[in-house]
């Protein structure tokens, strides 16, 4: 009976919706980040696409938008926030390859550790690039009159933390890179006598 019904009924069509807007990619990033926080490659993939895509119509924005000023502030805040998320993802990704210390007993894996540090350095450099991008959007925001945007206050908090000097990924990443260079030097100086 079930086989007969399946043969008579037309096949169900499955449709997927197109992902067209920055906010859609951002929501997918958020979902993936909470389910798989260590999947940096996919998290970065979603964020990169969000940075390249247009914004949704103000009616569908992640904040309540009632006028052009709010729309402008929303777009600048969102762009700054996306770049800050890229900084966080690349720093965390770099930490997967970074070695905090060059222990003498790691000499047998000296070359592997040096290679790992090179990968970490590349990710830290990427994080610095996105920090500069975030600062560009932050600077543009200074010229936009403040309006409260409900539902995205944490973006305003990021703006204020940068303004007040409480959030400076440039200095943080520079410390990461300085430590990395010191650790790399320690690994490069290792030989059989230090083991």
What are these regions (language model features)?
Residues 18, 25, 29, 72, ...:
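Surface positions of alpha-helical coiled-coils, especially the charged/polar e/g heptad sites
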Residues 1-8:
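Bacterial N-terminal signal peptides
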Residues 31-35, 50-53, 57, 100, ...:
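Surface-exposed polar/charged interaction patches
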Residues 10-76, 188-195:
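Immediate post-signal-peptide N-terminus of mature secreted/exported proteins
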Residues 64-81, 139-194:
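TPR/TPR-like alpha-solenoid helical repeat scaffolds
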Residues 78-81, 85-88, 92, 99, ...:
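"A position-specific structural signal for the A-helix of alpha-solenoid helical repeats
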Residues 34-38, 45, 64-71, 95-129, ...:
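Short coil/linker segments at helix-helix boundaries
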Residues 83-84, 88-93, 123-141, 166-172:
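Amphipathic alpha-helical coiled-coil segments
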